[in-house]
Structures are given as structure tokens and as C-alpha cells.
Amino acid sequence: VTYDFVPAIYSPSTRSGTLAFNQTTPRPIRNAVIQVREGTTILATGATDEQGSYSLSFNASGSGALSLVVLAKTTSPVIQVEDNTDGDAVWAISGSITTGNTTKNLHAGHGWTGSSFNPNQRTAAPFAVLDSMYTAAKAFMTVRPVTFPELKVNWSPDNVPQGGDKKQGFIGTSHYTSQEKEIYILGKEGADT
């Protein structure tokens, strides 16, 4: 299970940055919750490893379509990336599968078309956010044992740098709120992301 990692480039001379889509590389979606579902019923749950690999066993009843779902949520520590403009739904990618021994490779793409984002294909962003948070948490955990509280990160392509109703994407700027104990991250194309 992988996502498109797009490096950021900063120019000291122009004091501006951009994303280098021509340098995109696939990276593993690590320690993420992965599920086999039959319709809306969860048949099996597990986690990807550090290489984005997984193995799940399940018994299907045959009553619905089978799918493999990878959530933008890690298992330890628990970090999840939600869409604050869609009822706090956890971001995910999925694909259909069949019964029996199945290999299914899922990939979250960046959705950049060369001039703009295709919103239906912009699935890498929440996994890139998740991977950055997971990398930071792991860095702390390698120094000494740390018990992290569950962290909720709110990202949406509708999050803009305007104050107002966060459920509508008006988050002001990327920030942590101590009242909610959650992080909000800008996501609107061309709006300080």
C-alpha cells in the first residue's frame, strides 16, 4: 500500500516554495488500519507494516461486494486524518477484491494533472499528512518510551485561510486547538498549502 510523496522545494532567492510534482516517488503507507469489508460489514482488520505490506484472512458470506479499505489512521500511536468538512469521516482508499488468495496493491495518487488537481484523484494528501505525523511520533519513541494520546488531524481540500465555521473549511490557518485537542491543516488548492 503506497501513496505519492511530492517533495516541497523552497527558493531562498524568491522566498517562496512549491511542490515538485516531477520528483514524485511512491512511499509506503505505514502502520495504517486496513480492513476487508463485505458491503458495510467489516470482515477483517489489521495494519500495514513499515513497508506498506499486509496480510488478512477473512470468510465472506457472499451477500455483498468485497473491498479492501486502507484508513488514514495508524494503530500505534493512534493518529487519524479526518475530513472536517465531511462529518469528520476518516480519509481512506479502497479497491474491490475477490474471495480466495488475493493480492491487492492500493495506491493513493496526488491527482495533479499538470495545471490543477483532479479532486477525484487527490487521495495522497491525507496519507502524506499521516506519514509526517507518524514519522515525528516514531522519532520521539526511539529516544524513550512515550504514550501518545489519540491525535486527530483535520485536512480537507476545502480548508481555506479564512475564519469561520470549521465544518465548512474556514479554519483560519493551519493550527492546533487546545480546546478540541486537534490539528487543522489547510488544503485548498492555491491557498497557502
Question: What residue ranges belong to the model's regions?
Answer:
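Structured interaction patches on ligand/partner-binding surfaces of diverse proteins
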Residues: T75-W112
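Zn2+-dependent metallopeptidase catalytic core
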Residues: S57-N59, P77-Q80, H107-K152
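Short, acidic Ser/Thr/Gly-rich low-complexity loop/linker segments typical of extracellular
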Residues: E38-S53
